[in-house]
Amino acid sequence: MGCIEHKSQPAESAKTDEHSFNSKGEMQPRAPETPSKEFKNGKVVKVNDVTPKGVYRPDYKILTPNMRSPEYVQMSTAAAITLGVTNGKMYRCDCTRCLNLLLTYPEGCRANCAYCGLARHREAERDYADRNFIRVDWPSVPTEKIIDIVAKDGDQTPFHRMCISMITHPRSDADTLTVLKMWTDKISPETVPVSILSNPTTKTTGDVRQLKELGADIFTVALDAATPELFDRTRGKGVQSPHSWKKYWQILESARDIYGKNKFGAHIIVGMGETEFEVLNLVQQLVDMGGHSHMFCFFPEKGSLMDHLPATPKSQWRRVQLARYLIDYCDVRVEHMKFDSEGRVVDYGMGASELSNIIDDGTAFRTSGCPGKVRDDISACDRPYGDSPVSDISSYPFKLNKKDIKKARKQLNIPVVQNT
């Protein structure tokens, strides 16, 4: 989708203010505490050993059942509503187009990422199946039940994509393969394409290849942090977590070689202390590799080591959203752009009129992720309100209306271009 003429956007129409970004100095996670032995590795759930009965909705007033993959998986609240296994409504959304599945075990995720509600340090506070993740609860559902519902719907399924999300657990690699095979045995990848959100820490190149052979369409890696330093601070040794930047990139490069152009990507969280220049250089690097970036706006997750920190300012988020869209889909390069002394975008490397048209289209401000069945630049993984409240939406899970676009333009501080 080449769509632009590379002319400079006048700097005065992309003004920034001095407090419009989250700086590295302020975005410091708390130090993790070590849970006492009686709470480690899901001990409470395993000792009680409550037999699961169908769908389990997080409930802190009852004993959490002993559920584990591949027999059980968790799913986002939006997916559970769309599938019909739980009741609820979503603001301005009839459904979600991506069936997000999350592997689950009483031991939980053994990583300790600072921004994540599933992190290991929460063992004493909350059983794994009851923890919030990207702002919502994740009901646990028998895997066969999910597959049977989607298979029965056939071509009429509301889902344009399914994604298996791994966690850091000794069984996660093998169980991802099992869940994928259970799915593709009954549902054609042509009906519902499959993505893998991987855990590179335990992955090998052989694992990456085997997932493709079993029917996975897109392979993604959650880098999340935009620089090696921030990665180590939030996902590695800085928070007593096992992940490494080097291993994540090794698996990402394997995915490039095995899946091919436009069939791999990386998640990036904006606003954890990186500059806009740094994150957009990463976006450019991914595009040059043949992949895509899937952007998230930092929002302090309750119970995480960063829940005391500010959400990404909307001005910073909108600038990065817009610039990322231009790099990913409009043939603009980061070298065409200009940045101020704080690394903020002040020139998008595009003529004012063309840029204004892209803003007015609104697609740049929608949730980014793996594509569905509409357009390559419209994500099936719409994650309703996963990074903001409905009162001030960061990633729009639906087509923006004129009022939404007006608000996004105001947050960008880019005026409407008057046609002469």
Where are these regions (language model features)?
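Auxiliary Fe-S-binding modules of radical SAM enzymes
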Residues: 1-97, 280-420
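N-terminal pre-triad scaffold of radical SAM enzymes
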Residues: 72-122, 161-164
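Short glycine-centered, acidic/aromatic-flanked micro-motifs in structured strand/loop junctions
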Residues: 103, 166, 198, 268-270
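Core AdoMet radical
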Residues: 121-145, 149-175, 190-207, 211-249, ...
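Generic structural signal for well-ordered alpha-helices
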Residues: 147-150, 177-184, 208-209, 249-253, ...
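Conserved glycine-rich "GG(E/T)P / GGGxP" loop and the immediately following alpha-helix
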Residues: 160-186, 271-278
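Short beta-strand/loop segments at the ligand-binding rim of alpha/beta enzyme cores
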Residues: 188-198, 259-268
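Conserved C-terminal portion of the radical SAM core fold
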Residues: 218, 223, 227, 245-305, ...
